[in-house]
Amino acid sequence: MRRTRSTRRALLVAVCLSPLIALAAWQAYPFRSNNFDTVSVSRGSIESSVSALGTLQPRRYVDVGAQASGQIRKLHVEAGDDVTEGQLLVEIDPSTQQAKVDAGRYSIEMLKAQLAEQRAQYTLARQQYQRQQRLAAGGATRTEDVQSAQAQMLATQARIEMYQAQIRQAQASLRSDEAELGYTRIYAPMSGTVVAVDAREGQTLNAQQQTPLILRIAKLSPMTVWAQVSEADIGRVKPGMPAYFTTLSGEGRRWTGKVRQILPVPPKPLDQSNQGGGSPTSGSGGQSGSGRVVLYTVLVDVDNGDHQLMAEMTAQVFFVAATAENILTAPVAAIHDDGKGGQVAWVVGSNGKPQSRQIRTGISDRLRVQVLAGLEEGDRLLMAAPDGSDS
């Protein structure tokens, strides 16, 4: 009987102490809830940047075309060859141009012979006129004969001037024909690498309406990235801003450079661009209709001394607006607006309960933000505001 009473008394004491034990345990352990995740404030580095896709192109290149019509007799280079300024690249059959030059020279020779004949005629006409003047002084000739001799002398003098003008005209035509003959031998306008060949030996070129393109020469260093930046981010990109990029084949290597230029107008689609115009990014300026995306072209120059970068490579570009190292950082998702133009974070206090703190932040990337004031290293933050809070 005594054992039964003792047992009941122990159970009664346990029931009375259970709430006190639960309260003490709740206060002793940190705040936990299945509805919230916590993260810690830690030190790290943040880079505020704008990302974009781009295409690599040689900064300096020239398209070599033909100014003379005819069949390509010899092509002296292939794609990938290094050339020097003045090197012979292409020979075009010069038969037609050579015939024009020969005809021009023969025409000049004929005109010179005619000029010599007229000079002889002028000498004779002048002598006859002088003779008539002497006869007229003695009254031995008529006035009409003197006038006729004078007219003959002046006419031959005029023909001399006419032939001289014709010779000058023929010489000008000959220079034009000789220049066209020179166009049948095409030389490198600059030193560089042949990056494309668009013609073949035996191909006939017609340069009457437009210049046929034969090949392209480019300097492979420096290269230029033609990056496409959305209109939402273009305001953050400035000339002279540092930038870096990676390529698919670069195995994580970073190439660095600076923004050289921001083109003020988005590139036109290919169907709106003039032939031979546009840019390497033409056609990517956006879509028509309400879903149109406007992209602006930003040019970044980069050294390519080791020739690891090639034309038309795709580049993932990052324009660096600001950087900070060894700073307090917190996840962007853990920072909330307080509704008054400020920012707050919910910190798990020493008693395990969430506390609201006013904070001040600096630069941020897409994941973390710099903490300037209000938090300390190691603080535990709630990723979401607790139930019942104003934030």
From Swiss-Prot:
Residues 108-180 form a coiled coil. Keywords: Coiled coil, Periplasm, Signal, Transport. Transmembrane segments: none annotated. One of its GO terms (molecular function) is efflux transmembrane transporter activity. Its main location: periplasm. One of its GO terms (cellular component) is macrolide transmembrane transporter complex. It is found in: Periplasm. Induction: Expression is iron-regulated and under the tight control of the PVD-specific PvdS sigma factor. Residues 1-24 form the signal peptide. Residues 275-289 have a biased composition (Gly residues). PANTHER family: MULTIDRUG RESISTANCE PROTEIN MDTA, SLR1207 PROTEIN. NCBIfam families: RND_mfp. Part of the tripartite efflux system PvdRT-OpmQ, which is composed of an inner membrane component with both ATPase and permease domains, PvdT, a periplasmic membrane fusion protein, PvdR, and an outer membrane component, OpmQ. Belongs to the membrane fusion protein (MFP) (TC 8.A.1) family. Was originally thought to be involved only in PVD recycling. It was later shown to be involved in the secretion of both newly synthesized PVD and recycled PVD. This is Pyoverdine export membrane fusion protein PvdR. It comes from Pseudomonas aeruginosa (strain ATCC 15692 / DSM 22644 / CIP 104116 / JCM 14847 / LMG 12228 / 1C / PRS 101 / PAO1).
